[in-house]
Swiss-Prot record:
The modification Phosphotyrosine is found at Y600, Y928. ATP binds at I625, G626, A627, G628, E629, F630, G631, E632, V633, K651. Changing Y778F: Loss of interaction with SHC1. It is a single-pass type I membrane protein. Changing R743Q: In a gastric adenocarcinoma sample; somatic mutation. This is Ephrin type-B receptor 1. Residues 1-17 form the signal peptide. Residues 322-432, 433-528 form the Fibronectin type-III domain. The chain crosses the membrane at residues 541-563.
């Protein structure tokens, strides 16, 4: 292999076309043995060329006889795999005008022919002149002719002509020369073909490659990277043209990491002490500081002991070390607050990304044991990742020893097996007043007194001596307040006026003094009427007991009535469902009306009427793209006669089906075949006369709408989403006008093509869903399966499916689209969904959903089905929004719909998360995990400090994802501020 490669290097500069000779008469040492017809025509003789070399030639000179037709046939020539053949002919021709008394039939040209065959079929005895279908190559004319024969004077003029022919497909061929009245000598014939030579180019080896069948043909030659080189981008290839010359290469190889180019044709190993990290690098580089490469061909230099390289450091950067500890710590104690200041470390490890962590430890009086501080301790600006040499610490306990470790860390501290270098400072806090009392409760009230209680301050900072209560009438101000004291955390305030509202505050006292007053809270004394009613409180108790008994009896009666009505509704629902199948409806003039295929006595007749039968030979199945209820779904191609080939989706009926399953399967085609609308999936036809039975529809490249939106979360504008909704509404308007009720309208049943056009699909299958109890989407109801989250309440309760119930489902689809495929009602159970809807709760607006769109959703979710908009009205409303984008700028909020109770999805308890990974998983943004960790946001404490600029800096550019993450960070901050046990 190495020897072959060296040979290629020697040939690399010789890139001219190669010619491989198949026959050359100049090298013949004996008779050529060609066949002449007639025998008096061509004659083989020995002669001399212009250099007086002996050669075998053929000559003919019957110019004085008319009607000459002299043929000369070569022996069989093997083509050796060549597709195009070149013939070089050297000949002399006598000038007809130099011949005395020559008739007018004298010629100065001859014809060249060839005949392609797989074997030797012509001999001197059988030349098949009359049978052979010779193919003419060209008429050969002399550029120069001679008039005298004088070899001594060198007056003979030799012509050289080259002709090519092809394509050739047989094993070989014959050449034939036809003379029809010339005086000429055929001095030599060379037959050859061309090929592009082996070459090394762009660090790739290309083999010898034969030219194509035509002079304009380009033959692709695949290249192989030379040793220690690898392809870049597209596979490397060269084109060999018809002249045996290489064209401009496509793709390239480059030396792989650890190897550098040598004279553009070889890759040599980087010597020890050098490296090359990537293919793109030009050559080897010396190892950066504090690193080495003891062996050849190193793609990276390893760091010396005690030095490291951060994950985000490129190989070209010097290895660095961890910093030394901070210096010269100064502490300032103010009661239960501390300010720490320090100088940067003497040694930064060669890096400029030094930050500081503060480790707080609360100790016993003798400092023999310490424990981590609780989460109530506050650090400003933060505890971890400090960039400045100063921190303010508050909310400490009074009279308490603390130890603070100030760690210096940099980008490689996590690589070191040793803990970060730090400096410790021991501090004891001073005495301090107690913290604020968090809240007060009213225990009881009379006309002239109020009894209150409250919890102890979270930080008493010593023994509580007593409490001071300040109170005043709300109509006055605190300058007219009165004071009371209590030795315990309860107090009764007397001497108040009846029916008045009082503002009350409380504070605790220790030996260090009073703490701050609590927040203002209002309490009211009883009025005279309130007091009298309390005296009569026994009477309501008796009345309440009696009322409870009455309610119990009424409840029993009501349950009996409801059960009777449900049975009645059940019967009505069954009959109304059947009646709908036979309803003709009243459509617009000239509008087709949907015909239920199950009204046919023979359902196969409906298939024949509404679906076109396709010959299975026109269908080509390529790959599985899903599985349906009845069998697998494939992507394939359909080529009908006289039409272009198109991609299609192919639903198949699985083997072993019953006749009922076949009928149910084909009913969808009978339904779909009646529709013709740009927002309804188009039926191409069915295959019923072979197995498997197929339904063939147009192919939608982006698949189901719900999964498509989840894959592209936040990547579409509001106008684009409204455009999708408008298309779905237009398709449903068409179905409603045909009196067709879909029953299973959901984003999963909307398909999206490559132009983002949405089309309604999945017709008729909702009636025949299998009893798969593992699928929570569909729930049993009155003997059938219903997609509860998408279904109108009257359809759930009474199976009353109408276009109005489809409008309800369309409202849910709107919510799915605006939330980018979120599951309606989240993780609520189906029964909880039914209960919430019965109590008039509705879904809240998705994040950043325009108020106008959410209002349209609420209109679709009207309990009274007659109050819901029709699909024609929905289309008009969406058209107005598209024409007036400003109407979509107002974002909906839950508080903006006071008349309509909305469900509120609970925010996750972020304080329960311990890692950034857990948090990202909870908000479904786990794809950014590496971005957070690489940028140094390794704890939730650091994450809570992030801004929109930080998100951009770590590579989160999608506006929707930024908003989702920032909203979560905001919620996390709120929870941390409200939780006494939030993360540090």
């Amino acid at each position: 292999m190495a020897l072959d490669y060296l040979l290629l290097l020697l040939l690399a500069s010789a890139v001219a076309a190669m010619e491989e000779t198949l026959m050359d008469t100049r090298t013949a040492t004996a008779e050529l043995g060609w066949t002449a017809n007639p025998a008096s025509g061509w004659e083989e003789v020995s002669g001399y060329d212009e250099n007086l070399n002996t050669i075998r030639t053929y000559q003919v000179c019957n110019v004085f006889e008319p009607n000459q037709n002299n043929w000369l046939l070569t022996t069989f020539i093997n083509r050796r795999g060549a597709h195009r053949i070149y013939t070089e002919m050297r000949f002399t021709v006598r000038d007809c005008s130099s011949l005395p008394n020559v008739p007018g039939s004298c010629k100065e040209t001859f014809n060249l022919y060839y005949y392609e065959t797989d074997s030797v079929i012509a001999t001197k005895k059988s030349a098949f002149w009359s049978e052979a279908p010779y193919l003419k190559v060209d008429t050969i004319a002399a550029d120069e002719s001679f008039s005298q024969v004088d070899f001594g004077g060198r007056l003979m003029k030799v012509n050289t002509e080259v002709r090519s022919f092809g394509p050739l497909t047989r094993n070989g061929f014959y050449l034939a020369f036809q003379d029809y009245g010339a005086c000429m000598s055929l001095l030599s014939v060379r037959v050859f073909f061309k090929k592009c030579p082996s070459i090394v180019q762009n660090f790739a080896v290309f083999p010898e490659t034969m030219t194509g069948a035509e002079s304009t043909s380009l033959v692709i030659a695949r290249g192989t990277c030379i040793p220690n080189a690898e392809e870049v981008d597209v596979p490397i290839k060269l084109y060999c043209n018809g002249d045996g010359e290489w064209m401009v290469p496509i793709g390239r190889c480059t030396c792989k990491p650890g190897y550098e180019p040598e004279n553009s044709v070889a890759c040599k190993a980087c010597p020890a002490g050098t490296f090359k990290a990537s293919q793109e690098a030009e050559g080897c580089s010396h190892c950066p500081s504090n690193s080495r490469s003891p062996a050849e061909a190193s793609p990276i230099c390893t760091c010396r002991t005690g030095y490291y390289r951060a994950d985000f450091d490129p190989p070209e950067v010097a290895c660095t070390s961890v910093p030394s500890g901070p210096r010269n710590v100064i502490s300032i104690v103010n009661e239960t607050s501390i300010i720490l200041e320090w100088h940067p470390p003497r040694e930064t490890g060669g890096r400029d990304d030094v930050t500081y962590n503060i480790i707080c430890k609360k100790c016993r009086a003798d400092r023999r044991s310490c424990s981590r501080c609780d989460d109530n301790v506050e650090f400003v600006p933060r505890q971890l990742g400090l960039t400045e040499c100063r921190v303010s610490i508050s909310s400490l306990w009074a009279h308490t020893p603390y130890t603070f470790d100030i760690q210096a860390i940099n980008g490689v501290s996590s690589k070191s097996p040793f803990p970060p270098q730090h400096v410790s400072v021991n501090i004891t806090t001073n005495q301090a007043a107690p913290s604020t009392v968090p809240i007060m409760h009213q225990v009881s009230a009379t006309m002239r007194s109020i009894t209150l209680s409250w919890p102890q301050p979270e930080q008493p900072n010593g023994i509580i001596l007593d409490y001071e209560i300040r109170y005043y009438e709300k109509e006055h101000n605190e300058f007219n307040s009165s004071m009371a004291r209590s030795q315990t955390n309860t107090a009764r305030i007397d001497g108040l006026r009846p029916g008045m509202v009082y503002v009350v505050q409380v504070r605790a006292r220790t030996v260090a003094g009073y703490g701050k007053f609590s927040g203002k809270m209002c309490f009211q004394t009883l009025t005279d009427d309130d007091y009298k009613s309390e005296l009569r409180e026994q009477l309501p108790l008796i009345a309440g007991s009696a009322a409870a008994g009455v309610v119990f009896v009424v409840s029993l009666v009501a349950i009996s009535i409801v059960c009777s009505r449900k049975r009645a509704y059940s019967k009505e629902a069954v009959y109304s469902d059947k009646l709908q199948h036979y309803s003709t409806g009243r459509g617009s003039p000239g509008m087709k009306i949907y015909i239920d295929p199950f009204t046919y006595e023979d359902p196969n007749e409906a298939v024949r009427e509404f679906a076109k039968e396709i010959d299975v030979s026109f269908v080509k199945i390529e790959e599985v793209i899903g599985a349906g209820e009845f069998g697998e779904v494939y992507k394939g191609r359909l080529k009908l006669p006289g039409k272009r080939e198109i991609y299609v989706a192919i639903k198949t009926l699985k083997a072993g089906y019953s006749e009922k399953q076949r009928r149910d399967f084909l009913s969808e085609a009978s339904i779909m075949g009646q529709f013709d609308h740009p927002n309804i999936i188009r039926l191409e036809g069915v295959v019923t006369k072979s197995r498997p039975v197929m339904i063939i529809t147009e192919f939608m490249e982006n698949g189901a709408l719900d999964s498509f939106l989840r894959q592209n979360d936040g990547q579409f504008t509001v106008i684009q989403l409204v455009g999708m909704l408008r298309g779905i509404a237009a398709g449903m308007k068409y179905l409603a006008e045909m009196n067709y009720v879909h029953r299973d309208l959901a984003a999963r049943n909307i398909l999206v093509n490559s132009n983002l056009v949405c089309k309604v699909s999945d017709f008729g299958l909702s009636r025949y869903l299998q009893d798969d109890t593992s699928d929570p989407t569909y729930t049993s109801s009155l003997g059938g399966k219903i997609p509860v989250r998408w279904t109108a309440p009257e359809a759930i309760a009474y199976r009353k499916f109408t276009s109005a119930s489809d409008v309800w489902s369309y409202g849910i689809v709107m919510w799915e689209v605006m939330s980018f495929g979120e599951r309606p009602y989240w993780d609520m159970s189906n029964q909880d969904v039914i209960n919430a809807i019965e109590q008039d709760y509705r879904l809240p607006p998705p994040m950043d959903c325009p108020a106008a769109l959410h209002q349209l959703m609420l209109d679709c979710w009207q309990k009274d089905r007659n109050s819901r908009p029709r699909f024609a009205e929905i289309v008009n409303t969406l058209d107005k929004m598209i024409r007036n984008p400003a109407s979509l700028k107002t974002v909906a909020t839950i508080t903006a719909v006071p008349s309509q109770p909305l469900l509120d999805r609970s925010i996750p308890d972020f304080t329960a998360f311990t890692t950034v990974d857990d948090w990202l998983s909870a908000i479904k943004m786990v794809q950014y995990r590496d971005s957070f960790l690489t940028a140094g946001f390794t704890s939730l404490q650091l994450v809570t400090q992030m801004t929109s600029e930080d998100l951009l800096r770590i590579g989160i550019t999608l506006a929707g994802h930024q908003k989702k993450i920032l909203n979560s960070i905001h919620s996390m901050r709120v929870q941390i501020s409200q939780s006494p046990t939030a993360m540090a």
